[in-house]
């Protein structure tokens, strides 16, 4: 079974997380998300993550680490989440989407796609947010 691989960056700065308003698609209408996108053919995850975040939020990633992978059999997708803690450049929405820096505890006030609920729960357990 062939999967579509998607890389997602969780950008962390001083106990806040960067979120963007999801694109207007039928399955993500009025939702928030972490920036990222599809892995292109012949790209590895690291290259895709750096490319996607440069394209979407204008940053050059300097420090990151793998966080979680979630596989969705029914949609045939794999979501690869990375924690980004250091970068170069000023973060903004290059694609014109609404964005916010929010505290981890405030994530509960925003609607996210269902796969993110596991990620948000795991983030809340992490020491560097305490």
UniProtKB/Swiss-Prot annotation:
GO term, biological process aspect, one: DNA repair
EC numbers for this chain: 3.6.1.55
Reactions catalysed according to its record: 8-oxo-dGTP + H2O = 8-oxo-dGMP + diphosphate + H(+); 8-oxo-GTP + H2O = 8-oxo-GMP + diphosphate + H(+)
Keywords (A to Z) from UniProt: DNA damage, DNA repair, DNA replication, Hydrolase, Magnesium, Metal-binding, Mutator protein
Superkingdom as given in the UniProt entry: Bacteria
Pfam families membership: NUDIX
Residues binding Mg(2+): 36, 56
Domain Nudix hydrolase per the UniProt entry, residue ranges: 1-128
Gene3D superfamilies: Nucleoside Triphosphate Pyrophosphohydrolase
Cofactors demanded by this protein: Mg(2+)
InterPro entries: MutT-like, Nudix_hydrolase, NUDIX_hydrolase-like_dom_sf, NUDIX_hydrolase_dom
Disulphide connectivity of cysteines: none
GO function term, MF aspect, one: 8-oxo-7,8-dihydrodeoxyguanosine triphosphate pyrophosphatase activity
Coiled coil: none
Physiological role: Specifically hydrolyzes both 8-oxo-deoxyguanosine triphosphate (8-oxo-dGTP) and 8-oxo-guanosine triphosphate (8-oxo-GTP) to the related monophosphates, thereby cleaning up the nucleotide pools and preventing misincorporation of 8-oxoGua into DNA and RNA. It prevents replicational errors by removing an oxidatively damaged form of guanine (8-oxo-dGTP) from DNA and the nucleotide pool. 8-oxo-dGTP can be inserted opposite dA and dC residues of template DNA with almost equal efficiency thus leading to A.T to G.C transversions.
Similarity comment text for this entry: Belongs to the Nudix hydrolase family.
Name by which UniProt lists this protein: 8-oxo-dGTP diphosphatase
């Amino acid at each position: 079974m062939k999967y579509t691989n998607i890389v997602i960056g969780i950008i962390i700065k001083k106990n806040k997380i960067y979120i963007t308003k999801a694109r207007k698609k039928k399955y993500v209408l009025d939702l928030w998300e972490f920036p990222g996108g599809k892995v292109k053919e012949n790209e590895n995850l690291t290259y895709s993550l750096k490319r996607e975040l440069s394209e979407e939020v204008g940053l050059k990633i300097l420090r990151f680490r793998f966080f979680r992978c979630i596989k969705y059999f029914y949609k045939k997708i794999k979501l690869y989440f990375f924690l980004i803690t250091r970068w170069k450049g000023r973060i903004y929405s290059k694609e014109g989407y609404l964005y916010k820096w929010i505290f981890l505890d405030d994530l509960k006030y925003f609607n996210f796609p269902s796969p993110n609920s596991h990620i948000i729960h795991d983030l809340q357990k992490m020491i560097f947010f305490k």
